[in-house]
Amino acid sequence: MKSFCVKAPAKINLFLHVVDKKETGYHLIEGLFVFANLSNFLEIKVGEKDSRYDNSTVEFINSESKINNQYNTVMKAVNLLLRHAPVRTKVTVKVVKNIPIAAGLGSGSSDAGAVVRTLGKLWEIDRTILNEIALNVGADVPASVDSKPVFVRGIGEELCHIKKFSLPTNVVLVKPKKRFLSTPEVFSKHEGKFSEPIKWSDDAEKDLLKLLKETRNDLQEIAISFVPEIKDVISTLESQEGSILSRMSGSGVSCFGIFDSEENAKAAAVNIGKKQPEWWVCDTQLIV
C-alpha cells in the first residue's frame, strides 16, 4: 500500500465575470483565481494491485456540515481516475476539513484537485486526460490541480497561468458562520447583462491591482440578496487599516480583504474576530 499526505489550498476568486451562457445551461466565466495557505489535508492510500476498486472510500473529518461519503467531488475524482489506473486497485481518502464548505472558497474543488494531482502523478496519466477528468468533476477543479495563480476562461477549462504576481499576498478571509450558498442557485439568478470579455495579455500581470479595480464579482449582488450580511462583511474589511481591496469570493458567502502588510492583516483579523464573534475569520497568505 502507498500512502500520501497532501494539502488542498483554499481558492479565492479575486474577480469573477459572467460573460455568456451556453445552451446547455452552463455559464461562461472569466476570473482570476488564487490559492491560500489555508488548506484541507488529505491522506490518500492506494491499495495493492487486484484490490476491489469498488471498495474505495472517502471520509470527511471536522466538516462544519455533513457531507455524503458516496456522492462528493473526491469520490467522483477517484472513480474517474481509477479507469486509468494501470492495475485494479482501491483508494481510500481521509479529508480533514479546514476550509468552510459552500462558501466560495473551493473546499470541495480543491480536495478533488489534490486527488487528481496525486493519483495522476502516481499512475502517470496524461495531462490532457487529467484536465478532462478535472473538468468532469467540477468547473473549479482544473485550476485547483496546480493551485497556482491563474486567469480562467470558459466553464473553467481555459487556463492562463500568471507568470509574475504583482499583488501583496496578505489576505483576511471572513464568512458569517452557519451561512451557506448553493453555487447553482446563485448562478441561476444571474439574469442581467453579461460582462464584456477581457483581452488578457502579459501586460495585465504587470499591474494586477489596477486590473482588480476595473473588475468585480458579477455574483456579489445576487449573493447579497440571499445573505445581506455579506455587505456588512465587505464594508468591515474595507474599514480596516491597511486594506487595499475587499470583495466576495466565488458565489459566496466568504469575502476576502487584501492588505498592505502581514502585520495589518493579522491585526484586522483579530479586530474583526473580537467585534464579530458570529463570523469565521482567518488571516492567511496567498501561494504565488
From Swiss-Prot:
Record EC number: 2.7.1.148
Entry-linked InterPro entries: GHMP_kinase_C_dom (IPR013750), GHMP_kinase_C_sf (IPR036554), GHMP_kinase_N_dom (IPR006204), IspE (IPR004424), Ribosomal_Su5_D2-typ_SF (IPR020568), Ribsml_uS5_D2-typ_fold_subgr (IPR014721)
Pfam families per record: GHMP_kinases_C, GHMP_kinases_N
Residues annotated as the enzyme's active site: K11, D140
GO biological process, one term: isopentenyl diphosphate biosynthetic process, methylerythritol 4-phosphate pathway
Domain of life: Bacteria
Reactions the enzyme catalyzes: 4-CDP-2-C-methyl-D-erythritol + ATP = 4-CDP-2-C-methyl-D-erythritol 2-phosphate + ADP + H(+)
Gene Ontology MF, one: 4-(cytidine 5'-diphospho)-2-C-methyl-D-erythritol kinase activity
Keyword terms: ATP-binding, Isoprene biosynthesis, Kinase, Nucleotide-binding, Transferase
Broad enzyme group: transferase
Binding site for ATP: P100, I101, A102, A103, G104, L105, G106, S107, G108, S109, S110
Function: Catalyzes the phosphorylation of the position 2 hydroxy group of 4-diphosphocytidyl-2C-methyl-D-erythritol.
The protein, known as: 4-diphosphocytidyl-2-C-methyl-D-erythritol kinase
Source organism of this protein record: Wolbachia sp. subsp. Drosophila simulans (strain wRi)
Gene, per the UniProt record: ispE
